[in-house]
Amino acid sequence: METLSFEFPAGQPPKGRALVGVVGSGDLEVLLEPGQPGKLSIQVVTSVNGASLRWKHLFERMFDGQTPPALSIDIHDFGATPGVVRLRLEQGFEEIGHD
């Protein structure tokens, strides 16, 4: 198991929270909670050691050219593919957008 941390510039925190996905069977769980204004913090606990660069590039592609909401995101990964990671994050962002 490996724990990774990432930070990105962000806007204001949302009001909502979201929990998407399920840990197990090659999937992941993503918990999104309001964070500190101006900062998006991501912590990844993954079963795949040595994948820090892959995670970094995935997040950079997702947030390039946009200002995400200020969130604290916890990801519990059990070997999910980058496509599944992005899908779950997008589901979480949509969830917190609904009041």
Swiss-Prot record:
This is Malonate decarboxylase acyl carrier protein. GO terms for cellular component: cytoplasm. The modification O-(phosphoribosyl dephospho-coenzyme A)serine is found at S25. The keyword Translocase does not apply. Subunit of malonate decarboxylase, it is an acyl carrier protein to which acetyl and malonyl thioester residues are bound via a 2'-(5''-phosphoribosyl)-3'-dephospho-CoA prosthetic group and turn over during the catalytic mechanism. Its main location: cytoplasm. Belongs to the MdcC family. Covalently binds the prosthetic group of malonate decarboxylase. Pfam families: ACP (PF06857). Keywords: Cytoplasm, Phosphoprotein. One of its GO terms (molecular function) is acyl carrier activity. The lineage of its organism: Bacteria, Pseudomonadati, Pseudomonadota, Gammaproteobacteria, Pseudomonadales. The keyword Hydrolase does not apply. It comes from Pseudomonas syringae pv. tomato (strain ATCC BAA-871 / DC3000). The gene is mdcC. It is found in: Cytoplasm. It comes from the Bacteria.
